[in-house]
Amino acid sequence: MPKKRASNGRNKKGRGHVKPVRCVNCSKSIPKDKAIKRMAIRNIVEAAAVRDLSEASVYPEYALPKTYNKLHYCVSCAIHARIVRVRSREDRKNRAPPQRPRFNRDNKVSPAAAAKKAL
């Protein structure tokens, strides 16, 4: 039977066992190397309150702290939430990260980004 992926969908080379992690979405237990991992970096303070805090602050240039969360998704939840997409057999060999769409102020894709995507 042919192999679908060279990595078997994992990042485990030469290790017998890998500790499991829990999916953020459905709590399914999956091996850590198989999980789809994303970093969620957000401001602790919401955007509406940033100005109020900066005006009330004693320090002139105080940098507000951020939360750093590492999110682990199982394959089915990552596909369902469109974190990763199903790709064709040829496209699966492409290891480069996909181009991120650039948005302008009106939340529309910029013409330069749309032109690149069309090529």
Curated annotation (Swiss-Prot):
Native source organism of the sequence: Saccharomyces cerevisiae (strain ATCC 204508 / S288c)
InterPro entries for the chain: Ribosomal_eS26, Ribosomal_eS26_CS, Ribosomal_eS26_sf
Gene of this entry: RPS26B
Keyword Ribosomal protein set for record: yes
Its job: Component of the ribosome, a large ribonucleoprotein complex responsible for the synthesis of proteins in the cell. The small ribosomal subunit (SSU) binds messenger RNAs (mRNAs) and translates the encoded message by selecting cognate aminoacyl-transfer RNA (tRNA) molecules. The large subunit (LSU) contains the ribosomal catalytic site termed the peptidyl transferase center (PTC), which catalyzes the formation of peptide bonds, thereby polymerizing the amino acids delivered by tRNAs into a polypeptide chain.
Main location: cytoplasm
Molecular-function annotations in GO: mRNA binding; structural constituent of ribosome
Miscellaneous comment: Present with 503000 molecules/cell in log phase SD medium. There are 2 genes for eS26 in yeast.
Keywords: Cytoplasm, Ribonucleoprotein, Ribosomal protein
Source domain of life: Eukaryota
UniProt xrefs under PANTHER family: 40S RIBOSOMAL PROTEIN S26
Transmembrane intervals: none
GO annotation, biological process: cytoplasmic translation; maturation of LSU-rRNA from tricistronic rRNA transcript (SSU-rRNA, 5.8S rRNA, LSU-rRNA); ribosomal subunit export from nucleus; ribosome assembly
Keyword Plastid included in the entry's annotation: no
Family recorded in the similarity comment: Belongs to the eukaryotic ribosomal protein eS26 family.
Name the record gives this protein: Small ribosomal subunit protein eS26B
UniProt GO cellular component terms: 90S preribosome; cytosol; cytosolic small ribosomal subunit
